[in-house]
Structure formats: C-alpha cells, structure tokens
Amino acid sequence: MALTAAQKSQIAAWYKALQQQIPDFIPRAPQRQMIAEVAKTLGGDEGRHLAIEAPTGVGKTLSYLIPGIAIAREEQKTLVVSTANVALQDQIFSKDLPLLRKIIPELRFTAAFGRGRYVCPRNLAALSTDSASQGDLLAFLDDELTPNSKEEQQRCAKLKADLDSYKWDGLRDHTDQAIEDSLWSRLSTDKASCLNRNCHYYRECPFFVARREIQEAEVVVANHALVMAALESESVLPEPKHLLLVLDEGHHLPDVARDALEMSADISAPWTRLQLDLFSKLVATCREQFRPKTVPPLSTPERLNNHCEEVYELVATMNRIVGLLLPPGEESEFRFPMGELPQEVMEICERLAKLTENLRGLAELFLNDLSEKTGSHDIVRLHRVLLQMNRALGHFEAQSKLWRLASLAHASGAPVSKWVTRETREGQPHIFFHCVGIRVSDQLEKLIWRQVPHVVVTSATLRSLNSFARLQEMSGLRDKAGDRFVTLDSPFNHFEQGKLVIPRLRHEPLMEHEEAHLAEMAAYFRAEYKKGEHKGMLVLFASNRAMQTFLSFVPDLRLGLLVQGDQPRYRLVELHRKKVEQGEASVLVGLQSFAEGLDLKGELLSQVHIHKIAFPPVDSPVVVTEGEWLKSLKRYPFEVQSLPAASFNLIQQVGRLIRSHSCWGEIVIYDRRLLTKSYGKRLLDALPVFAIEQPEAPEALIKPAPAKRAAAGRKGAPARRRNTYR
C-alpha cells in the first residue's frame, strides 16, 4: 500500500502543530528527512525495512511517532515502539506521547513493561499486613511471605494504599518511593509464580490491566525482549501483519536476541534428582486429588518413574564426562572448541531434548487441567498445586530449550557456543551447561523481518567504522532483500562546540602496565578537577577492575565522586544534576552502561574522560568461539569482531558530550593508540569532527617527584584539520 495524499497531509499538519507546542522549537532538515524516510517505509512506498541512523539532536522519537501514528490510523494497525531500556521506554510513554496527545485528538497509547517491573498485588497484600493479622492470606501462597520489620510493613502498606486509590499504577518506576532490589524481588513475581486467571487479584493486577490495555491502544511502547517473546509466542501483541514496528536503540537488537536465545541450566545430578522426585510426587497428587479429565500414559507411576530415571542416568553420565573436562578447583570453566561436542555428549543432549520435552508437555497438560477446576475444589490446596506445577513447567521448558540448542551444530549459519562451569553454592559443587548462538540473523528473519511487513530500525549509533556492515551481518538486514540504510547528518557543529584531548602519557593502557597507566590517568584527572573549569564531568571505564584501581589513586576525591554501584543510576544522575545546579562540581564515574541514555546538557556535562579504547573481552566463551569460526573462514577476528565493537563503544562514549546547540566542552581519551596505531585513524574518522589537542602530561607523571599537587602542563593548539595533530 502506497502513502496516500491524506496521510501526507496529516503528517505535515501534525508536524506544523508540534512546532507551536514546543518552546524554542528549531526546525531541522535531518528531522524532516527522517519523517519522510519513515513515512515511505511504513507506508510501503519504498523498500522492505529501514535502518536509519539519527544522530543526537535530530529528534528521532517524534520523527517516527508522527508518521507512524498517521499511517497506523489510516491502515487500522497498531504502532509498536520498542526500546532497549526502561528509561527510554518510560520517556516515550510519559513525555513524548502525552505531548503528541495535545495535537493528535483521542490518541490512545499504553506501555508494555516486563512482568518484573510491576508489583504483584497478592505479594503486596501479604507484605503490607503484619503476620498476626494475615489470617488465611498466607494459605494462598506457596512460600511464606511476611514483612521483615514493622518499617517494611508500613512502607508496603503505603504502596498498597496508593495502588488501591489509583495514585500508583503498580509500575516500579512510577512510585516516588525508592524500593531497594531486595524488597522489590518479594513485591514482584515471575511467570512461574503467577497464578494468572486463577488469582484472586487477577482483575485489578497492574500487569494484566496493562496487557488488556494493549488491545485498545493505537501505540504500544515495549522493549526488544518483550517484542521478541510476544512474536515467538503469538501473544500480547496483535498479529504481526497488523503491526507497524519501530525498533529504537536498534543497535541492541542482535544482542537482545542472542540473550533471549541463550540457555543455561544447573545439570548437577543431585539437583536433577530433587527436581524429578518433586515432579513425580506432584503428578501423583494431581492424579489422586484432582482427577484429570484425561490421564496421559506418561503420568502412570511406572512409566513416569522409568522416564525420570532415564533422565537422571543421562544427566549423571553427562556430569561424569564434563567433570573430567573441567579444570580442578571450586570455580572452573571448560569451553568446547567451535562449539563441537564429543559424539557421546551430543547423543546425550539429543536424547535429553526429547525426554525433557515430554516432561514439559506433561506439566503443561496438568496445568491446563488444574486451571479449569477452580470452582470444584478447595481453593487453597488447588492454588498451591497450581503454583508448584507452574514452576515445574518453567523448569522443564528451560531444560528442553537447553538440550535442544545443545543438539544444534549451527544456528544462523554459525556455530553454537557451548561451555560448562563449576560453581560452589552453599558449600556444594554445582555444574552448569551453557549454550548461545553466536549469530541470530535467521531467528530475527523468522520472528521479525519476514513476519512484520515494514520495520524501522533506528538509533543514534547504528554504524561502526562508518559502515552498516556489522549491523547487517548481525541482524540479517540486507540490501538484496529490499532493506534500506540511511544516515542523517548531525545538526551540531562539533568542531566549534568541543575538542578532543589525547594527553601525552608514557604508558599505553595494556594489561602489563594497566596500574601505571591508571596512575597517570588519575594524576591528569586530578589536575583537571582542581582547575574547576568544568562543573559536570563523566569518567568512563572499560572494566570494573580498572575503575576500582583508578578510585584507589584518588581517595581524597572519593566523597565527591558519584560512582556506579553506590546507588541506583537514576539516583546518581539526580544527585549530579542537583549538585551542578547548585553551583558545585560533580563527577559521575561508571562503565559502558553510563555511555548510553545519559542526556546531560550544557554545564551538566562539559568534560568526558574515557579510560581507553573499549575492545570486547577476549576471554568470553562466545567471543572466543566466534573468533575460532571467523579464522576457519579465513576472516580476521580483529577486523570483523573487535575493531567494529570498539568503534561502536567509542562513538557512544564520545556522544555523551554534545547533546544540544548549547553544549560545549572536551573529551579526554587516555589512549594514544588512537594516534600511534594504524587502526587509530579509522576509529577517529568514525567520530564527529573535533579539534584535537595533545597536551603534555603533568610533570609529576613524567619522572618521580616529591608528593605535591600535579601541575597542569602546556596545552597544544587545536588541530585545524582532522589529520593534523599538535
């Protein structure tokens, strides 16, 4: 279906009305171009899918929402906007869509967050009531759930009052209370512990209320993992053919798909025996007390016992084999080269895939039967068995998927990375089996590209090394299939607004002298901090080890640093804003996750410090397997794997500085390999064009000296061209 004149007119009218709603709105050519490109794709005018890189400042969210809503209304489809993190998801839901509602009459939208973001009203009721007053409530719960203290009970009672009075929608991110993870893990629930329609609280449950709203919404804001799960299970979202799909932060999609397909499970023989015995007893209880309408042959005691015994014997054999492969020690790991399993292990995996799938099917059958008996049995006893069977189903689902994936030699034309680990838990050794495909393009083709007619993939960073090649290889999007790849210009003048500083340090950030390099970095940072020229600063590290070593060199500054892990990220950012707005200096210190989604403009962030070029870890089983596979194809892993990933990370880190026309400042990168290695120029060429300075290191760094304040050295003049350095 081609874009109609009415749709074009509607898009233009809404865009014009938007300019009147936003103070100091600046019309931008890249934004108009993006609106046009998105409209052509979603309207079916041009190509299959669109990958469009929209640099910071383009206004990409409104650029896809306006044409997306116009086309969705005309074609009576649902616009699904998917993001990679909760912060952006909530921004679109709480800020961008309410803004558009002012110019788009009767706009209906909702958000679909993961189950774990919502409070479970059943758990909340238990935790908000003191144990003496709970009465029969706990009888509905399989696990004892009582408040740990009077203070905790009062906090939960306040949450319950807000939920009951509709002041709170049950979403963790929408309460003004700071709820620590330990409490939230008890307030929320997961699929295995949810009674679904059989729960007394089902009708008012925030999670299910939100799911029901999806059916009436024109726009649904979700996340990548939820979208993939929904398309795979054909639930939650409308049929793919009735969707318009926008994948914001689309560079995360291959990783999210890989994470969703990664399977790990405890395969320790004692643990397996425990799970099988519990399931056998549960099946016997169902047969005796709840009389299923149909009795599966596998549920007879003798057959089920023999079936479970075969599972146990195979797992025990697997334990013996991998036990010989694992290095000695409490914590150890063994990776199967190229993901190739010994023949005996492969045969065990294939057999276990069939056996555990049979157990999964049996659990599902009993669960469905139990769900239909709520009116004819003791509700307390039934609910307990329902919960136990639901958990058994989750266990065997995971086992079945694990052994099925382990049985595959290849997925998406590449090996499946497989490894085993030994861990000690509560003093007992446990063996875990892990599988993950190193390519997921076939799965994405099957779930998304082939099912949804038109998809827009967008992000401020889709390319690495000025190329879409890595995205194409990892996602399966390709020119030959009619997919288009577009790059928009940045609306900012980076050369005038900022500069890139690469200090002349003695050491490169290599492992053999990491500590010496970090000592130099700390001294340079200290000198910059003491100058007081920048109120808002950000320091980014490639690893937690490096971050902690750096902090050990600046103990006197530690109280003034807001370090990742000290508090939740949103709280650290709030404190940072408050300090800078009060005229104080503030420094955020974090890892790569702080290089994404951090939008601090003007004085809030005017100096970014980057520890080093962040190459991916070389000891990850997935990375090592991918490297082996690339070498077998006569491809150079550094070129295909490491360098594109490093370029991508660096672009994101550098992108924290210039967020608006009023932003200014400098980016300090403590890695001279950008200037001394052949690949350095390629990494620099993929960045926005900045003036480049190479200041001398402070004197205290060049030769040992008595302890004193490090003095700032002379700075060189800015480079006038990209490849000219001072």
Regions found by a protein language model. Give the residues of each.
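Walker A/P-loop
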Residues: 44-66
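Conserved interdomain hinge at the start of the Helicase C-terminal
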Residues: 446, 503-542
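Signature of the SF2 helicase/ATPase Hel1-core->accessory helical subdomain module
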Residues: 64, 70, 90, 94-98, ...
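A contiguous, basic/glycine-rich beta-loop/short-helix subdomain that forms a polymer-engagement track
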Residues: 185-218, 228-237, 366-506, 512, ...
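Conserved RecA-like ASCE P-loop NTPase motor core of nucleic-acid helicases/translocases
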Residues: 78-87, 456-460, 535-542, 669-670
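A substrate-engagement module of RecA-like helicase motors
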Residues: 2-20, 26, 75-78, 83-218, ...
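Conserved RecA-like P-loop NTPase helicase motor core
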Residues: 503-513, 566-675
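Conserved helicase motor "Helicase C" RecA-like lobe of SF1/SF2 P-loop NTPases
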Residues: 542-566
